[in-house]
Amino acid sequence: MDLAIEKGPAKILARIQPKVAMSMLTKMEAIAANPAARHANVEKMQGIKNAFRLRHGDWRIVYEIDPNLAVVRVTKIGPRGQVYR
């Protein structure tokens, strides 16, 4: 599957520490390569179909899997307290 990062999360990735951003991208690429596998620190989100969250330290990455388009789309990236609002 392809990995698509929306405009808002892309801006956040550009502003955070490069080492942290690269680590996040590496994890997201691994998920996009095999979304059906079990990945550490990933949980399905309630109330949103095909939506998951990845925990990366104090950061959360919310993404959706679109099996029809074969895309993993990152919709939100932020600190734990802000990403779920």
Place the predicted regions along the sequence by residue.
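Phosphate-binding glycine-rich loops and adjacent basic patches that engage nucleotide phosphates
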Residues: 21-26, 47
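Enriched for short, Lys/Arg-rich terminal
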Residues: 2-7, 11, 19-22, 40, ...
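A short, surface-exposed loop/turn module that caps and links secondary-structure elements
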Residues: 29-53
